[in-house]
């Protein structure tokens, strides 16, 4: 490192002073990474679930127009929460926001459709337990049984694989389901 510093000084004393005296470096430009994409999606879904719970109507009565308006608002709120207004700085990034809105809208549409077609009802969102946070819990009750469904919001295309589960490579959903079952057992002794 010392030799590099000497070489830097020999090539340009001013550059040496800027780098080692003032400790300046090139400004890092913001990049919207896959982790940011996933966090933004997750936050938008969380906002939607909260808004849906506060509605005066059952979520199964949400119209397509209401859903789209809520999704737009939720994505915008999640961008603000994520302190990421830099997303509006280029046309490409604005396009990413449009894509995010479409992805969230498709996901919400599918979840609402599942609720309309079945007997499961959302009973919890962002449910914390000692091993993590379950994005969503739905339950269905009949006279002597409670059925539980957990949803983990993901932006990728990874699906559950029983072989990976068997070898301990894909345990998250099973751990979440076990935690959800324990929580339901406490509610229904």
Map each language-model feature to its residues.
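Short, well-ordered loop/turn and helix-capping segments at boundaries between secondary-structure elements
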Residues: 19-23, 27, 46, 50, ...
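Accessory/regulatory regions of helicases
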Residues: 1, 186-188
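C-terminal, charged and often intrinsically disordered regions of DNA end-processing helicases
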Residues: 1-47
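Non-catalytic protein-protein interaction segments used by genome-maintenance enzymes to assemble
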Residues: 124-184
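A non-catalytic, helix-rich entry segment at domain boundaries
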Residues: 43-129
